[in-house]
Amino acid sequence: MEAAAMAVTAATGALAPVLVKLAALLDDGECNLLEGSRSDAEFIRSELEAVHSLLTPNILGRMGDDDAACKDGLIAEVRELSYDLDDAVDDFLELNFEQRRSASPFGELKARVEERVSNRFSDWKLPAASLPPSSVHRRAGLPPPDAGLVGMHKRKEELIELLEQGSSDASRWRKRKPHVPLRIMGGEMQKIVFKIPMVDDKSRTKAMSLVASTVGVHSVAIAGDLRDEVVVVGDGIDSINLVSALRKKVGPAMFLEVSQAKEDVKEITAMLAPVKSICEFHEVKTICILGLPGGGKTTIARVLYHALGTQFQCRVFASISPSSSPSPNLTETLADIFAQAQLGVTDTLSTPYGGSGTGRALQQHLIDNISAFLLNKKYLIVIDDIWHWEEWEVIRKSIPKNDLGGRIIMTTRLNSIAEKCHTDDNDVFVYEVGDLDNNDAWSLSWGIATKSGAGNRIGTGEDNSCYDIVNMCYGMPLALIWLSSALVGEIEELGGAEVKKCRDLRHIEDGILDIPSLQPLAESLCLGYNHLPLYLRTLLLYCSAYHWSNRIERGRLVRRWIAEGFVSEEKEAEGYFGELINRGWITQHGDNNSYNYYEIHPVMLAFLRCKSKEYNFLTCLGLGSDTSTSASSPRLIRRLSLQGGYPVDCLSSMSMDVSHTCSLVVLGDVARPKGIPFYMFKRLRVLDLEDNKDIQDSHLQGICEQLSLRVRYLGLKGTRIRKLPQEMRKLKHLEILYVGSTRISELPQEIGELKHLRILDVRNTDITELPLQIRELQHLHTLDVRNTPISELPPQVGKLQNLKIMCVRSTGVRELPKEIGELNHLQTLDVRNTRVRELPWQAGQISQSLRVLAGDSGDGVRLPEGVCEALINGIPGATRAKCREVLSIAIIDRFGPPLVGIFKVPGSHMRIPKMIKDHFRVLSCLDIRLCHKLEDDDQKFLAEMPNLQTLVLRFEALPRQPITINGTGFQMLESFRVDSRVPRIAFHEDAMPNLKLLEFKFYAGPASNDAIGITNLKSLQKVVFRCSPWYKSDAPGISATIDVVKKEAEEHPNRPITLLINAGYKEISTESHGSSENIAGSSGIDTEPAQAQHDNLPAVRDDYKGKGILLDGRCPTCGRATKIEEETQDRVADIEIQTETTS
């Protein structure tokens, strides 16, 4: 809340940040403010601080219908004044020394404050929140009684089946399907069914001939009991023109069905269908109906309430009005439930209680009474519109679970509540109310139009506005009903011209808050909007910049929020974006395994545009916009969105004042974007030209020459630029540069002059290297170079002391510079899909904050903690330079992606290096490769390491004698991994007392039935075997060892012990190796047997001398593992060793 109080908001404008900026100006002795100007600034600051102190707790912290407050004349004046004051401060700071001495920047603003704020502030009171009667809240989402329940029958049957028969869907969640537009584009097979009164075969032949001659039609047939249906299958069919032609030449045709052809439908259904269990069938005792406002949640719940009511001894239908907290109406809701339950079956829905709760004692009394009354009864409880999880917890507590067939139905528009219900209760089935299909949506809209008698005047083909309404409403029943009704009211003004038609539809959209016939729809949307805190409303209103045909890119929107001053940190903004998803305002499509995209329902966008207009927050201009209205507005345009098809010449020809516009977003290819008069935008801070294909290098150079010096955000993603011009250096205040998906191949040296740059995003470009001037960007906290040909990062990245996020995903980078350890504020390092397998050990200095994304998964690897300070303080300066050759941090491992990075000693060694023993005793994890055995003194050193929790031992050659682990030391060790041809190891009594995980990676070798002794590992929980994919799991050395472990696992006191054996039994090579001869070495690289480098290392130690192997150090023939080949991690399957208990 403290951060939100200092941000730009839709209600208070730039009031909070401009007060901070004004205070800094007054405190800066080098600004050369004249005495008169200083006095003006101090007066303004004093007056506005008093206003801010009043508004902050009363507007920022409260929910509900505060439109009366935010639209109040004084608050509106303060809001506009804050923007002008912000501009005035920046205007003054751009002046040179001499100009400042003669400037009077605040004189006019002081007069405005005196006249319009100070004189009215003394007796001004904050307008009270005006909430409509609670009955309005309950009924706002219901369609009119005569609207008909089009499309509800299928939902009703599905829900009744769930309640009566249960579900075999193991996911317990029926997802809504993505909306398919009414017009199915070319290339996709579609099925269209028309109903036409055809009295004889002549009219049928005429209809079939007409349809068969239509472009895209593959087949046509007559169907229906009365042979009055025409079934058409094809691709790219213009269904609107076809139905218009049938009406003109055959008779009054109407749509019965518009869908994808059967083959495609089957495929899509299979893709969207949840995973179902084969044998299980679960009883469904509670259904959570989830959906958008106006989606039919309450309507279908009411239908179920009446359809099933006679099957239950008592039934309840209770609604909950939204509030800022769960407490105000909860007691009344409980009383309502109790009263209805006692009445038994009732035909009248409850009337909301308007009073407030009378304490927890009464609440608990009601809970106890409801629970006692329902305990022995078959009940149907419907709770409509849950807004707070705490509400549902209390209500759920009052409803007892019994075996008498009681059922509970709840509705909510909040994804977060549905997800928590799904997680917390296995009896809950989440049913997402999907959109009406195109057939039902068309029938509903066209039926309303024809019922009013306006069907003949509504237009045909492309001029049929019902077509536009169906596409805009995305199958939302309430929107279809009320927008179609509003269309009837506007029917006389419809014309044939395309632009006129768009303007009429735009007029209906823009009138959601004003047109009386749309009031029920507006009230339904207002419930969710007013339930948001102000900071979320501000972020949501900014989304009105999008057209309903646009998909929202999460990163792009989040970064614009930051540039606008609504949020300060990207992580915070990401959290807010997720909150808008949870509250149902932004819809996410896709899942964790596919591309995610986001959108806002077109009706919600229209509502947000109307709200934005009330605050003078953002102005949208697109095809069909009434430019005269925008030009004649008495308010200045603060933020402007130009949408596809808008003629930008209007900006120059109209009297529209954009000199105070701080944000310009151009969506899609507007007409002649290079003709946008950027010189008119004198105070622009945010410029987004992304995905505009007409922007090229020459245009960008001209744009940079015209741009305001105070631009903070420049979005050029998806444009056709090939280089960044030198003129960009003038953008001294640029904070976010987004040039991804362009054709640029280098960053200019001038990039170093952008001292305030915070985010640099060059993903999906042809950039091959970062310039050395990158070191000058001391404010940079996000560097994203993913999907570029960059193969090396310069050491200068270590100078970026404020860097928090570095992404080199899907690049050619193999190794990170050691200077990365100097990035003390780094929080996220993304090296997925690269050859980076290790980090320099210096990265351990930032382990407490750093999260590493490695491999090809999204699971983060935490770096080892608790040893950084000891490492730094315990290593002499002269020795520290050599440590890079001795130690690194492995983030990708042959055993699988570790959850915690492991300190790794590169290369192969005869013994544990002396430097490790002298300076790295404090390590919490260690991965080392030895040539053929673990010497006694080395084992003693490992056993006495005080913090060692994870140990990985790898052996180049097969140890001649088993390595014995006795009961001394290893007190902290929890994970032990052995990488050897065959695991020659034996655990004695009380060995490794806290070991929980034992893991083997092995290949092939002589069979042995020697005991391993896992029964002596008292804390053991899991044993994992990973066999090399080049050898069969039934090779003698492998199968014999597995058999030994299986037998010991059956005898372990902790049984059952989980045993994991790799499931990759299929041969990767046509040649398998089952003997101990000619076997691949167990190096860090899986190579084909013919390429093994160390297959025949002698087993006798003396023979190593002749092969260049140092007795007291590394084996130089192995080298440092910097060229580890990428490989797919072994898959493992669970095999639980079950033992029969003996009596």
From Swiss-Prot:
Residues 191-264 are annotated as: HMA-like domain. The keyword S-adenosyl-L-methionine does not apply. GO terms for molecular function: ADP binding; ATP binding; metal ion binding. One of its GO terms (biological process) is response to other organism. It comes from the Eukaryota. The keyword Ribonucleoprotein does not apply. The HMA-like (RATX1) domain is responsible for the specific recognition of AVR effectors. This is Disease resistance protein Piks-1. It comes from Oryza sativa subsp. japonica. The lineage of its organism: Eukaryota, Viridiplantae, Streptophyta, Embryophyta, Tracheophyta. The gene is PIKS-1.
